[in-house]
Amino acid sequence: MFSIFILTHNEELDIAACIESAVLCDDVIVVDSFSSDRTLEIAQRYPAVRTFQHAFESHGKQRTWMLQTIPTKYDWAYILEADERMTPALFAECTAAAKASEHVGYYVAERVMFMDRWIKHSTQYPRYQLRLLDKAHVWFDDYGHTEREVVNGSAGFLKETYPHYTCGKGFSRWIEKHNRYSTDEAKETIKQLSEGTIDWRALIGGKTEVERRHALKDFSLRIPGRPLVRFIYMYFFLGGCLDGRAGFTWCVLQAFYEYLILLKVWELKNHPVAPAELSKSEVTEHTTSDISTTLPNNQHPTCSKAM
């Protein structure tokens, strides 16, 4: 068996459905980044679910912190985000994989659900994320707005997939979120162009989709006209045109996101606006409690902050 972590921040529209998709697990833990909506209240309605709060620094740090700090019933854990769902078939395969322990982590492919349909082609399906892991052998580093896994051992791939409702809270929320993401991606772009390298071996002959995708990401940062190139690649070469109106909209939004990143790169180089000041003010709201946990008996033990 394995535990399930659910990462949240202002997820009142998704958290109930996410938790209910994970009910086959007897150790579900919600890790909330101090939501300002009803996320925590809704999660606490489920007696078997434990809830923790921890101030968000980055995706990599949040994952590593929860894996190293929060006690779990099992050595193995699955990382689930609020706009994703566990399925019975995936749960069964994860249970078998954790029991066999042939690897220290397993990648799972997502099915991007957008505008009421599965976007199969332009999302690079099957696109794998490391989700099932032995907590003692996996942690995460930051990369752009997201994270990259560090695996101390071998990793395998599961056959079952999970649905990811990327725009379930509406286009306004999607645009707001990617506006924030683009700032981190712009910083990563500047860093990679200055210090990074391209792994040509992985780009040309990588053994796994994950290797090839990471190398392609690093390579794409150096391509002129990235927004247009990305649209052409996704819509025509990957087959986004086969996904109908939703596929076209998805490709346009991804090209817009790339253009927003380039605008932020230009801004950071020519007119830096010190966005870190806002981040610091948001973080200091919670300096009085690095972590709080709500259990069924309403006790509030504290844990020392990791990292």
Model-inferred region functions:
Residues 5-24:
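Short, well-formed alpha-helical segments that are part of the catalytic scaffolds
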Residues 16, 37-45, 89:
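Acidic helix N-cap motif at the loop->helix transition within catalytic regions
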Residues 61-67, 87-269, 304-307:
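Catalytic-site signature of metal-activated, phosphate-bearing donor transferases
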Residues 12, 21, 32-41, 56, ...:
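A conserved acidic beta->alpha catalytic loop
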Residues 296-301:
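Compositionally biased, intrinsically disordered low-complexity segments enriched in Pro/Arg/Gln/His
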Residues 64-76:
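Active-site nucleotide-sugar/metal-binding loop of Leloir-type enzymes
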Residues 1-3:
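Cell-envelope/extracellular polymer assembly enzymes that use nucleotide-activated donors
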Residues 33, 54-56, 74, 81-84, ...:
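Short acidic donor-binding/metal-coordinating loop in glycosyltransferase active sites
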